[in-house]
């Protein structure tokens, strides 16, 4: 029996959009405060005082709608994957749905699975559309992640997200899913208990038994079941908590770094958690050619990975310029110091 996940009707992406806040803090500025001189990234994004996961999701959703060119009322589900929702009890997806004019005839929910909550929403949307229950569903991955002051996570925990509108594969879809595969184990590498402000992690335990075990198994299984090798893919996007991990995963799997670098943004915007691979794939779609095949592999602590094989279609050529591109947001930046960063992130407890 095949391990692949395939819907009864083929599903594609009819619209996508990303958003990254414009504020940045350099890793060396964080290091200056804490006396650290080696850094996992160059700089990271910081949300503005009036930005949160919902506003990031709204901006990304609006960009996705611009490319999809459909009436938002046709969207029958909006699912937001995040681990930093503004409300403990109140859905964020409903706010996004209202803001883009999609209410009231739709389903909305918030998904959680650490950093792979966004691709959990993608998997659900593929099933929803692929089953014929709906013709359009939106999946969003967005976060405004936090790191304890002085902890090495503080150097990478960032903000950003992306939205994807899924539809039955047609000449209007700009890419389609060949198949997907999910792999999960009970691996307590990273967690945050209720009422705690910052997450805790298992240091080195987050690497080999968590990130690499899930990523490698998910990617290998998907490729083996499809009969593909790294040579069959033009791009590969892996979850990117830093720069080192995805490049190491690529090397283990046999992908040259040239296929990874176009979607590897963590070095210049940080780890956007649930948005990480969704933003990375959006950057690849901004430059990909029809016929290109993309390997997309997420990771979420706790732990698990979703792997997708995505094939770019002709419609990408006419649709990608209908909304701001991912690098437009990456290159739009305003640097702040640690004091302003602490203010923006609510690190002052009065």
Curated annotation (Swiss-Prot):
InterPro entries: ACP_syn_III_C (IPR013747), HMG_CoA_Synthase (IPR004656), Thiolase-like (IPR016039). CoA binds at residues 204, 244. GO terms for biological process: acetyl-CoA metabolic process; farnesyl diphosphate biosynthetic process, mevalonate pathway; isopentenyl diphosphate biosynthetic process, mevalonate pathway. The keyword Transferase applies. It is an enzyme of class 2 (transferase). Pfam families: ACP_syn_III_C. CDD domains: init_cond_enzymes. It catalyses: acetoacetyl-CoA + acetyl-CoA + H2O = (3S)-3-hydroxy-3-methylglutaryl-CoA + CoA + H(+). Keywords: Acyltransferase, Isoprene biosynthesis, Transferase. Its EC number is 2.3.3.10. One of its GO terms (molecular function) is hydroxymethylglutaryl-CoA synthase activity. (3S)-3-hydroxy-3-methylglutaryl-CoA binds at residues 115, 156, 206, 239, 271, 301. The keyword NAD does not apply. The active site is at residues 83, 115, 239. Pathway: Metabolic intermediate biosynthesis; (R)-mevalonate biosynthesis; (R)-mevalonate from acetyl-CoA: step 2/3. Catalyzes the condensation of acetyl-CoA with acetoacetyl-CoA to form 3-hydroxy-3-methylglutaryl-CoA (HMG-CoA). Functions in the mevalonate (MVA) pathway leading to isopentenyl diphosphate (IPP), a key precursor for the biosynthesis of isoprenoid compounds that are building blocks of archaeal membrane lipids. Interacts with acetoacetyl-CoA thiolase that catalyzes the precedent step in the pathway and with a DUF35 protein. The acetoacetyl-CoA thiolase/HMG-CoA synthase complex channels the intermediate via a fused CoA-binding site, which allows for efficient coupling of the endergonic thiolase reaction with the exergonic HMGCS reaction. NCBIfam families: HMG_CoA_syn_Arc, PRK04262.1. Belongs to the thiolase-like superfamily. Archaeal HMG-CoA synthase family. This is Hydroxymethylglutaryl-CoA synthase. It comes from Thermococcus kodakarensis (strain ATCC BAA-918 / JCM 12380 / KOD1) (Pyrococcus kodakaraensis (strain KOD1)). The lineage of its organism: Archaea, Methanobacteriati, Methanobacteriota, Thermococci, Thermococcales.
């Amino acid at each position: 029996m095949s391990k692949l996940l395939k819907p009864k009707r083929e599903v594609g992406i009819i619209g996508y959009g990303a958003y990254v806040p414009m504020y940045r803090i350099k890793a060396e500025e964080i290091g200056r405060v804490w006396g650290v001189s080696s850094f996992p990234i160059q700089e990271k994004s910081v949300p503005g005082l009036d930005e949160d996961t919902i506003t990031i999701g709204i901006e990304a959703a609006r960009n996705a709608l611009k490319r999809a060119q459909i009436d938002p009322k046709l969207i029958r589900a909006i699912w937001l994957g995040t681990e930093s929702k503004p409300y403990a009890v109140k859905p964020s997806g409903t706010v996004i749905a209202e803001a883009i004019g999609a209410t009231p005839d739709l389903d909305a929910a918030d998904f959680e699975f650490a950093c792979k909550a966004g691709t959990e929403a993608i998997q659900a949307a593929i099933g929803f559309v692929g089953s014929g229950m709906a013709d359009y569903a939106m999946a969003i991955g967005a976060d405004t992640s936090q790191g304890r002051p002085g902890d090495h996570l503080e150097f990478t925990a960032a903000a950003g997200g992306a939205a994807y509108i899924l539809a039955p594969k047609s000449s209007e879809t700009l890419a389609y899913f060949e198949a997907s595969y999910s792999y999960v184990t009970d691996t307590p590498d990273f967690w945050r208990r209720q009422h705690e402000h910052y997450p805790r992690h298992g240091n080195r335990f987050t690497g080999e038994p968590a990130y690499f075990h899930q990523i490698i198994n998910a990617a290998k299984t998907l490729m083996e079941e499809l009969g593909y090798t790294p040579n069959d893919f033009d791009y590969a996007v892996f979850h990117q908590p830093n720069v080192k991990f995805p490049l190491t995963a690529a090397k283990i799997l046999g992908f040259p770094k040239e296929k990874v670098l176009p979607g590897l943004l963590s070095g210049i915007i940080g780890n956007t958690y649930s948005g990480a691979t969704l933003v990375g794939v959006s950057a690849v779609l901004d430059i990909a050619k029809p016929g290109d095949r993309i390997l997309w592999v997420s990771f979420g602590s706790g732990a698990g990975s979703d792997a997708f094989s995505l094939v770019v279609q002709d419609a990408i050529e006419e649709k990608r310029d209908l909304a701001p591109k991912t690098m437009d947001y990456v290159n739009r930046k305003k640097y702040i110091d640690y004091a302003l960063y602490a203010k923006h992130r609510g690190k002052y407890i009065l």
